[in-house]
Every structure is written in C-alpha cells, then in structure tokens.
Amino acid sequence: MDYRVLLYYKYVTIDDPETFAAEHLEFCKENNLKGRILVSTEGINGTLSGTKEDTDQYIAHMRADERFKDITFKIDEAEGHAFKKMHVRPRHEIVALDLENDIDPRETTGKYLSPSEFREALEDDDTIVIDARNDYEFDLGHFRGAVRPNITRFRDLPDWIKENKEVFMDKKIVTYCTGGIRCEKFSGFLLKEGFEDVAQLEGGIATYGKDPETKGELWDGKMYVFDERISVDVNQVEKTVIGKEWFDGTPCERYINCSNPECNKQILVSEENEHRYLGACCKECAEHERNRYVAKHNISDEEKEKCLENFKETVQQ
C-alpha cells in the first residue's frame, strides 16, 4: 500500500485564516494531496490522503512552521486516495460546538489519559465513559460500556449533557472521540459546567487502536471515519460486529446514505436490502421523485412498484 491517510489537529493561533487557507490549498494541490482541512483563528483540523512521498512532504512542510512543529499526525496505510478532492476552508471553529462562550482547550480541558490509563478507566465501575461522537458513529463501533449520547451533530452534545446532568454530575467522567479534537473542547465544556473529575483519551480511538500495549482491546465493531473508507478496524485482538441492519436487524457494517437527496440519513444496510428497498430508509423516501438509487440503476416503474411493496413487511414505512 503506497498511500497513506493523515489525521491531525492543533489548537494554535492563526491570525489570518483566509489567507492561510488559500495558500495551504495551493500547497496541497501542488503535492497531489486530497482531503478536507478546516482553518480558524483557533487552529487547524485536517485529514488528507496521498502517496507516502507526498504525505512525508506535507508533514515536513507543516513541522517547518513554528506553529505546528510539535503537531501529531495519526497515520493509516491505504490502497489509494481516501478523498475525491482537496478542500481547505476557513471557519469560525475547527470543530463546531457553537457555544455562546467558546472553550479554549489551551486554557480549559480535561486531564489526558494514555491508552493504558484509558483501558483502566473502561474497567473501573466508578467511571462513566461518554462517547463524544455522533449516534451513527457509535452504532458502528464503540468502547465496551460507553454511554451513547442521542445526538446526530457534535454541537448538540452540550444540550444533551445539560438534560442528563443529574445522572453524571458526581461521577468520574472520561470521554473519547475519533482523533481527540472533539474531546479537547467537550471535556473543557464539562469542567465549565461544574463537573470536577474529567479526563479524555489522548489521541482518540485512532491512537488507542495502534497502541502496542492495549492493541485496541475493549473496542467492539469498527471506527467510523469521514472519508471514502467509511470505517476502519480498531481491535487487534478480537473481531466483533455490533452494527445492526436497518431493516432486519442482522449484523451489518455497511453504511449508505438514504437515496432520497432531501433525507440523506445514514443507515446500515446489506447490498440485498439496498436493492430490495431502493436504497431508501423508508417508503416515503423510496417514492421520492429524485430517488438516486432508482436513477443510477435505471429502475423501471414496474420494478419500483414491486420494491415499494416490500415496505409492507417492515416497520420502516
């Protein structure tokens, strides 16, 4: 595998995000890289793919900048590019929590736990482990015993915490996310909310899965990633499938977007059921005039009607 995927972030002052983003995009394109990078006055958050040579060049370029000299890159081997295009965009935040009073992780954040320390926390009955990711990420894979917030966007997490504050307030809290960036702010938010004992998995799931001591133990399922790979393995010791097929509840790790472009809900679906239900999450979406699955596969009106009949056998109507 000659390609690699880089995942990284750094909370650091960038005075002119717009100019930085434009110049950075040019550099990335010149070096054949593809991916998504967000830049703001609070720092940089990126994931990109390229050949080993091109990603080495990128790492060297970043570390030559005093602001990013100690940045940590999480590196995965890949068969090819994990993205179709290269985007570098200026944003208000590099991870959107949308708080009235923003959190600066350089000033307020939870205690950092190494992978081995985090594993101890997972096995501690007195510790509450909260997944800081979205529900569809959790449903594909998570740490054993972790709490699943009922959210589809990171910015909804503070409200969920406030609604459940009494359940967690006097507990030891440990949180985790994909690469660590969300927990930097989320753990800081918890401290601002009055939680006293707050810690986070340093480097996130991506680091835990590659740790030679923990080897990804106590992780079930796969880790959702925001690129064309969709998911990657974490647990090097044992393989478990915890995802459940949207229609029949059987074990499944295959995510698709609902074929209704106005819905786009992410659902776990087998190839057989994707065809059986026209790539949709419900009958209403299957009937949509701009159903992408119908258009892509040139489904006839007669075949479409047969597929719509299948919804009579399911609760997803």
Curated annotation (Swiss-Prot):
Belongs to the TrhO family. The active site is at residue 177. It comes from the Bacteria. This is tRNA uridine(34) hydroxylase. PANTHER family: RHODANESE-LIKE DOMAIN-CONTAINING PROTEIN 7-RELATED, THIOSULFATE SULFURTRANSFERASE/RHODANESE-LIKE DOMAIN-CONTAINING PROTEIN 2. The gene is trhO. GO terms for biological process: tRNA modification. NCBIfam families: PRK00142.1-3. HAMAP family: TrhO (MF_00469). Signal peptide: none annotated.
